């Protein structure tokens, strides 16, 4: 029974274990900022520059732009390809340069509005969508983009108004139908929202994932 004193030495070792723990919270904090760009990417896994540079469309457009940096159409097209591959910052840069050369390009304003909405730059997105709609009133794509921007910003009534206007022009616009469903649910009209969502899913089963990629669920 004299061995009862032996449990005490291990206790001395215990204090050495806790010190590493304070570092864990620091490591846990940065990740939340990183996931969005990854989640947003549609199909291609990593959208790192080597992969983008190898894309044949981007390659040929970049070669075109090397010869003529003021080719607004090539900048716009490359911006579209970047956006489709989840390289949103590069897309914004190309749309901005394209608009510098062609300040009345409604499509470029709408595309930059949409990309800025996806990355959460909502104030700038609103300006772009409003400019697109000033240049081309009732432009269905810009109404759809602004609806998404309002939905992300929690402006559900404005989102419903934008999606309503878009659906009046194109009743089969799945993104507006699904977006309106979410906005209606959040605004308290749950049954109406459910109906819009069910109809949108029947038209395009991928719409749920698409919106999740935009940061909207």
What are the language-model segments listed below?
Residues 185-217:
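Terminal, low-structured helical/coil segments at or just beyond the last alpha-helical repeat
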Residues 64, 97-98, 131-132, 165-166, ...:
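Canonical positions in the second alpha-helix
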Residues 84, 118-119, 152-153, 186:
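Register position in tetratricopeptide repeats
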């Amino acid at each position: 029974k004299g061995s009862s004193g032996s449990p005490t030495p291990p206790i001395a070792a215990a204090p050495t274990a806790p010190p590493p723990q304070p570092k864990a919270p620091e490591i846990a904090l940065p990740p939340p900022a990183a996931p969005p760009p990854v989640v947003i990417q549609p199909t291609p896994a990593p959208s790192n520059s080597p992969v983008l540079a190898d894309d044949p469309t981007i390659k040929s457009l970049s070669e075109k732009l090397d010869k003529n940096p003021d080719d607004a159409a090539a900048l716009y097209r490359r911006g579209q390809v970047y956006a489709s591959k989840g390289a949103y910052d590069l897309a914004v840069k190309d749309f901005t340069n394209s608009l510098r050369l062609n300040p009345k390009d409604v499509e470029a304003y709408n595309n930059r509005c949409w990309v800025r909405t996806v990355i959460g730059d909502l104030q700038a997105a609103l300006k772009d969508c409003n400019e697109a709609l000033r240049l081309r009133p009732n432009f269905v794509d810009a109404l759809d983009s602004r609806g998404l921007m309002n939905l992300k910003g929690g402006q559900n009534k404005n989102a419903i108004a934008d999606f309503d206007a878009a659906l009046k022009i194109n009743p089969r616009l799945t993104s507006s139908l699904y977006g309106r469903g979410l906005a209606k649910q959040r605004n308290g009209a749950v049954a109406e929202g459910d109906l819009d969502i069910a109809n949108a899913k029947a038209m395009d089963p991928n719409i749920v994932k698409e919106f999740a990629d935009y940061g909207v669920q």
